[in-house]
């Protein structure tokens, strides 16, 4: 069934010619795209000639794959409470988290999150150092330099979500970004 969906997406959806574009999306210049979709629609329509890193977290439809090599993830949410989820494993293979691991879908997004966290930690550390230097300085010119440096803005990372149902089955990934 999953392979049939993959063929449909790769052949039919992939063959649709798009004549209209959203200028709102077109004017974005992302460095990274985390796709929960199986098709490369965004990449084909908006990502041409841009240096964007893509991560297809639920796999990417590919006509050249087969039943064994297909990495599309179709799954359910963890619906059991904490006591039962580790002991009742009969539906484990249907859960999205398990399938993402088992099918080795992309997880580059974890590196992206680490980089954002590191940038923020460095920003905070630099701010603390500047403020400490400001407090300890007796030279008014240096105090001014430290104060101006302390006003440096926090690194900005924008998150745009489109084409996603925001279903609870993907909350583990979305929570990392939000």
Task: List each language-model region with its residue ranges.
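SIR2/sirtuin-family catalytic core signature
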Residues: 29, 50-51, 144-178
